[in-house]
């Protein structure tokens, strides 16, 4: 039946070019499709030299602030920065001390789930995929909102801040439900401490003993910041544009975006990177043998192994040609954590694949621009070191 449906439902691929139909958010030449305008973030991938645009190291700006400067300032002050960057993205300016204090207090106020929500919604229907679990929880929160359908700016802002506050609990509690009911592990549900940052809340809820190191929390905080915003043209954000244009409610729009984010070509890529490397480790005898690694990467591209999709996950980007600035920042942090946690050999393997993959892709595929590792590449290793490998952050 499936073959009959396929044979009677195919469209000649040449017609897409003939009528200039976009089949996704990327053109045939690999460039991203313009889907809208934003002043929340700015991406720079080219610079003018002698009147011509030439590729350059990528730059990312949040509301006019270079993300390198944002992260650098946070590291210099040895503080957590996720909450203040949320404020920046929402309101367009950096908060002063009083504004940040009030905003953090608001996040803490909303950091609670309805009574019996964990038992009735999260634990009763565990899912092997955390994005599926979170999306279902978000949709169900509609039923606990006294004013769910109001799409005024004030109400949508309130709903979004509440969702930002509870996402750590939705994800970690969903993970615990999966571990308990589908993997026969012990079940434990911790409450979020009001004095903790978002990164600390995630790690505290995740661990049986609630313990984590300052380095773990700071690196996770950095990862959260680097994944927050990227030009407004990605798949899940585009999904939000489409769905909200119908006038639907906040919970439905966010659930739709999460459904998009679940896909392995979008937000699910960091989980795919983790599993791809687990597969590589099983089949590569010598992690320092470039030739053996390159041969196996060719097999991945030729759909002979791993998930047979022909993709080296974590490589390439729709916009960046030379480098992804988020990846550069994250790589340095992951290297520090890998050294502290005893993952030096794993990190070295990631570096080798990062170096060899562009060569293999260039030999096997027709490419229109440079191929470099993106922010998902090292995040897979990071989340596995933090025991977050199955949780989409």
Q: What are these language model-derived features?
A:
Residues 1-391:
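Non-transmembrane, aqueous-exposed alpha-helical and coiled segments at domain scale
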């Amino acid at each position: 039946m499936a073959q009959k449906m396929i044979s009677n439902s195919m469209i000649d691929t040449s017609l897409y070019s003939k009528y200039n139909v976009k089949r996704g958010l990327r053109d045939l030449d690999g460039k991203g499709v313009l889907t809208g305008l934003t002043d929340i973030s700015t991406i720079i991938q080219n610079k003018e030299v002698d009147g011509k645009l030439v590729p350059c190291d990528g730059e990312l700006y949040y509301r006019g602030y270079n993300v390198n400067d944002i992260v650098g300032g946070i590291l210099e002050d040895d503080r957590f920065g996720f909450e203040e960057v949320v404020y920046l993205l929402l309101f367009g300016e950096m908060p002063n001390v009083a504004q940040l204090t009030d905003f953090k207090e608001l996040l803490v106020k909303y950091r609670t789930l309805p009574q019996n929500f964990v038992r009735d919604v999260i634990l009763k229907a565990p899912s092997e995929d955390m994005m599926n679990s979170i999306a279902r929880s978000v949709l169900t929160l509609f039923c606990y909102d006294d004013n769910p359908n109001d799409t005024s700016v004030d109400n949508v802002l309130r709903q979004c801040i509440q969702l930002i506050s509870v996402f750590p609990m939705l994800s970690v509690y969903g993970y615990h439900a999966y571990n308990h009911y589908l993997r026969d592990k012990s079940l434990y549900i911790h409450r979020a401490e009001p004095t903790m940052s978002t990164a600390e809340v995630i790690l505290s809820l995740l661990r049986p003993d609630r313990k984590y190191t300052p380095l773990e929390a700071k690196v996770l905080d950095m990862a959260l910041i680097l994944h927050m915003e990227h030009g407004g043209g990605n798949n899940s954000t585009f999904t939000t544009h489409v769905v909200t244009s119908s006038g639907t409610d906040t919970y439905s729009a966010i659930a739709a975006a999460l459904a998009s984010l679940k896909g392995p070509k979008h937000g699910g890529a960091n989980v795919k990177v983790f599993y791809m490397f687990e597969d590589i480790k099983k089949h590569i005898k010598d992690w320092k043998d470039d030739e053996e690694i390159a041969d196996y990467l060719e097999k991945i591209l030729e759909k002979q192994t791993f998930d047979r999709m022909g993709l080296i996950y974590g490589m390439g980007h729709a916009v960046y040609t030379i480098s992804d600035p988020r990846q550069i920042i994250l790589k340095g942090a992951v290297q520090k954590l890998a050294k502290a946690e005893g993952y030096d050999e794993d990190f070295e393997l990631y570096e080798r694949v990062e170096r060899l993959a562009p060569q293999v892709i260039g030999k096997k595929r027709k490419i229109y621009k440079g191929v470099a590792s993106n922010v998902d590449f090292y995040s897979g290793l990071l989340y596995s070191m933090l025991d977050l490998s199955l949780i989409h952050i």
